Amino acid sequence: MYAVIKTGGKQYRVREGQILRVESLGANEGDKVEFDQVMMVGEGADVKLGAPLVEGAKVAATVTANGRGKKVTIIKFRRRKNRSRTKQGHRQNYTEVEITGISA
């Protein structure tokens, strides 16, 4: 069984037992979280599509880790201007979850 969930402004296709990195949820390690914005649920040829969400569908998960991703570097150059260069960078926070159940 698989599902398409929406969290952190992104959509993910998940199935039970899968480990997934999503935008930071603010939950501690070992906490149980529930995603209720389920856009699609499928098992074999049986597919339920939401418009935009599937009613009553939920995906349960357990938080396995919190961390920070690799550094993303941004460099801006402005042509024909003396010393007009900018270098910035940031590390995005993430939450790693393990999908424990899908119910529709």
From Swiss-Prot:
Keywords: Ribonucleoprotein, Ribosomal protein, RNA-binding, rRNA-binding. This is Large ribosomal subunit protein bL21. GO terms for biological process: translation. Signal peptide: none annotated. GO terms for cellular component: cytoplasm; ribonucleoprotein complex; ribosome. Belongs to the bacterial ribosomal protein bL21 family. It comes from the Bacteria. HAMAP family: Ribosomal_bL21 (MF_01363). Part of the 50S ribosomal subunit. Contacts protein L20. The lineage of its organism: Bacteria, Pseudomonadati, Pseudomonadota, Gammaproteobacteria, Thiotrichales. One of its GO terms (molecular function) is rRNA binding. Pfam families: Ribosomal_L21p. It comes from Hydrogenovibrio crunogenus (strain DSM 25203 / XCL-2) (Thiomicrospira crunogena). This protein binds to 23S rRNA in the presence of protein L20.
